[in-house]
Every structure is written in C-alpha cells, then in structure tokens.
C-alpha cells in the first residue's frame, strides 16, 4: 500500500504541473507541435511497461485492434489534447487544470448512455456538485474569456469520451490501461504528424491562413526546438506524459482503480496552488468556491465507486456461497 501511495504522489505531482509546464513554453512551440512531441515521447516511455503487461497474454495486432487504437488515439491526442493545448494558450493554466479535471465527472452520464452503467443517487449528487463548481469558476456574470473556457470544457468532454472508448476497448479486447494508453498515444501521435504534414502543403496552408486559422497553418515538427526549451519538452514528454501515466497505472496495480483515481481528485486543488507560486496566477473567491465544490463532488464519486465495488464483491461472494451450498446438497443427495 505504501508503494501505491508513492506512485499516486508522483503521478499527482506530474499531472498537476502539466498545464503550468505547457504555459511556460506556450510561446516557444506551436500548440499542435508540442502536442505531437509530448505524446510521441510519452508513448515511447510507456512502451516498456506495456510490453511487460503483454508478455504471455497471447496478444496480437489485427485489423480490428489497429482500427480501435487509431480511433482512440485520434480522440485523445488529435481531438481532446488539441483543445487542451489551445485552451492553455487562451486561458490561465489554473483554470484549464480545474475544468479539465472535471472529465471524470463527464464520464458519469457518458457511461450511463454508452455503457449502460447504473446511474446512482450519489453519482447524480457528484455530477451536480461539480457542475455548480464549474459555474462558479466560469462566473457567467463576469465572463471575459469565452474562448479559453469553451476550449477547456471541450477538452474535458472529449477526454471523457476517450475514457469511455477505453472502457469499451478493455471489455472487448481484454487489455489494460497501460497497453491502451501506450498504443493509443503512439497511434494518435502518428495521426497528428500526418495532419501536421498536410498543413505544410502550400494551398492548404494558404487556405488555413485565409480563414483565420494561422496557428494550424504550416505547423513545424522539430523547428524551433532550442537548448532553452529542451528541459521543458523533456519534462512534458518524459515526466508528465510518460512517467505520469506510468505511475498512475502502477498505482492501480499496487492499490485499486478507485484509489488511483485520487490523482484526478487532488489535482483541482493542487494545480491552482502551484500555478499561484510558479506563474503568479491569483486564486479568486469564486475559483476557490468552485474548487471546493468540485473536490466535494469528486469525493462523493469516489465514495460511490468504493461502495459499488464492495456491493459487487458481496454479490459475488453470495453467489459463490450459494453455488457451494448447492453442490454440497447435490453431493449429499447422491
């Protein structure tokens, strides 16, 4: 258990500094370029752990698995993380960190509609508390950054959809989170590279500039990388994306999925504090109220998950006991 808590601590630290590290180099890299580089590096760092998980499992790539990884990678890296990168450009790192952490809350209704998972009263309470917290942070009465808020929420919603895709893939193909992430990150990085190369075609680049999408025109791949930006790039690729997810999955192995999810429940509180000290981003009263409500909602959901897991274990134990009694009665009858 102690080892699991250490893994959670490191994963929380890396994930909580993600938006801050990106903000520090936002002016040195194109958002799409940085997205491509950090997930490519992250997939390489995750690969040894994924290979270890696949040993002796009889896993083999076929057309359906390749298509699945291409789809999940596209949803995560190309769609969700592009919204995420752009959100950090247009909004404060602390705001993006808090709103993006709500992706776990958006999973609740998606799981109900797409996975037919039961929607409990506690889940509804968690969802309501987190939504009110988001409204406090957004502050509709003084909404001055519509673009940044919208991009942050789009990143959270699409990442929640990626989580649902991951669950469906796990149920269908039987691989775990580390394999899912490693292959999806690699597939998504290659897809993003292809799109980046397309933006370099002259007529495509000219059209993107003419419609006001200059950030998506002629996107660099390696250009602009300097000695001053290399440490931040290594931190984002190796530590945040690679080791952050590695420690998260190792925490799952050492504890449980619900305990490991504490990473995303602590982040909304820790990230703004780190942003205050590193970037000087002030925590206003409405943001503080939003953090408290989101943390409350997250705690309710964690309690709900633990309660549901205990009920399932009791049901399984009851079924096994009933089966054992039935077998004993049959043997006695004979």
Feature names for model-found ranges:
Residues 28-79, 106-107, 158-165, 181-203, ...:
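Transmembrane alpha-helices of multi-pass small-molecule transport proteins
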Residues 3-11, 58-83, 147-155, 207-243:
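Loop-to-transmembrane-helix transition segments
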Residues 17-21, 51-95, 99-100, 108, ...:
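Specific transmembrane alpha-helical segments of multi-pass solute transporters/efflux pumps
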Residues 33-44, 84-118, 123-124, 155, ...:
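Specific alpha-helical transmembrane segments that line the substrate/conduction pathway
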Residues 46, 110, 119-139, 151, ...:
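Hydrophobic transmembrane alpha-helices of multi-pass small-molecule transport proteins
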């Amino acid at each position: 258990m102690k080892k699991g808590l250490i893994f959670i601590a490191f994963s929380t630290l890396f994930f909580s500094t993600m938006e801050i590290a990106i903000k520090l180099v936002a002016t040195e890299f194109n958002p799409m370029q940085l997205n491509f580089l950090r997930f490519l590096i992250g997939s390489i760092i995750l690969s040894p752990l994924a290979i270890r998980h696949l040993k002796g499992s009889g896993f083999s790539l076929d057309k359906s698995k390749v298509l699945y990884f291409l789809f999940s990678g596209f949803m995560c890296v190309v769609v969700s993380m592009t919204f995420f990168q752009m959100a950090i450009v247009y909004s404060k790192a602390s705001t993006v960190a808090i709103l993006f952490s709500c992706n776990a809350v958006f999973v609740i209704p998606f799981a109900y509609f797409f996975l037919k998972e039961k929607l409990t009263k506690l889940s509804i309470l968690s969802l309501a508390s987190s939504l009110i917290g988001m409204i406090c942070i957004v502050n509709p009465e003084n909404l001055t950054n519509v673009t940044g808020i919208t991009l942050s929420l789009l990143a959270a919603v699409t990442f929640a959809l990626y989580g649902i895709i991951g669950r469906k893939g796990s149920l269908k193909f039987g691989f775990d989170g580390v394999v899912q992430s490693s292959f999806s990150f690699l597939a998504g990085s290659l897809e993003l590279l292809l799109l980046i190369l397309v933006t370099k075609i002259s007529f495509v680049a000219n059209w993107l500039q003419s419609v006001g999408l200059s950030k998506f025109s002629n996107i660099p791949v390696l250009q602009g990388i300097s000695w001053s930006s290399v440490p931040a790039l290594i931190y984002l690729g190796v530590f945040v994306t690679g080791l952050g997810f590695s420690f998260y999955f190792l925490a799952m192995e050492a504890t449980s999925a619900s305990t490991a999810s504490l990473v995303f429940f602590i982040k909304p509180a820790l990230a703004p504090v780190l942003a205050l000290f590193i970037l000087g981003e002030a925590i206003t009263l409405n943001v503080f109220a939003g953090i408290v409500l989101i943390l409350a909602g997250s705690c309710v959901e964690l309690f709900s998950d633990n309660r549901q897991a205990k009920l399932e274990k009791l049901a399984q134990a009851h079924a096994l006991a009933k089966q054992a009694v039935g077998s004993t009665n049959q043997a006695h009858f004979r």
